Amino acid sequence: MTEETPGFEEKPDVPSGATPDDAEPQAASEEGAAPAGDASENAGLVAQLDQVRTALNERTADLQRLQAEYQNYRRRVERDRVAVKEVAVANLLSELLPVLDDVGRAREHGELVGGFKSVAESLETTVAKLGLQQFGKEGEPFDPTIHEALMHSYAPDVTETTCVAILQPGYRIGERTIRPARVAVAEPQPGAQTVKPAEDAAEAQDSSGAEDDAGTKESGGPDEG
């Protein structure tokens, strides 16, 4: 029976004729392959990172676009809501204008007394809170966008078409005119603008003649020959 000698291990099989120097190139090639593999892996990670960044930028742009569209939608809905409210209020107040006209006539004739006066004042306060404004005053220039001329006349003391009487007041809500003011207007007297310059020229000529006479008197008259 063969006994193993303590302290000795079996040696690996080594090809015949191999030397220790033959193992060094193999180890060097394995060490050189490792950095090349790391560089390839890093390049792949960089490419993936670029793809993720591109996708993130695209999604961010999509979210920003959706947010802008939503904000525009909210503003449009709010604008439409305000417009619908204004139209509804205007339609309601238009139905109350004849009542307000009756209240105004009663006030002019001194008939706005008692309980009728309280109801009328309450109505006027309510419509004012809803934004109803009355307009139209005597003496203001005629504006066809807010005035409706029912009567025409001529007056020598006006230089432009002027409202001389308010037959029915106008009403508006903000910039929206519910009813134009119905008025009587006076226009400048025909020929007044042409006569006045002639009168001014005559007055200027008379004044010039008077100055010439005064100068002649101061100089002692013409020289005696």
Curated annotation (Swiss-Prot):
It holds the Pfam family GrpE. Homodimer. Its main location: cytoplasm. It comes from the Bacteria. This is Protein GrpE. HAMAP family: GrpE (MF_01151). One of its GO terms (cellular component) is cytoplasm. NCBIfam families: PRK14163.1. Belongs to the GrpE family. Transmembrane segments: none annotated. The lineage of its organism: Bacteria, Bacillati, Actinomycetota, Actinomycetes, Kitasatosporales. It comes from Streptomyces coelicolor (strain ATCC BAA-471 / A3(2) / M145). Keywords: Chaperone, Cytoplasm, Stress response. One of its GO terms (biological process) is protein folding.
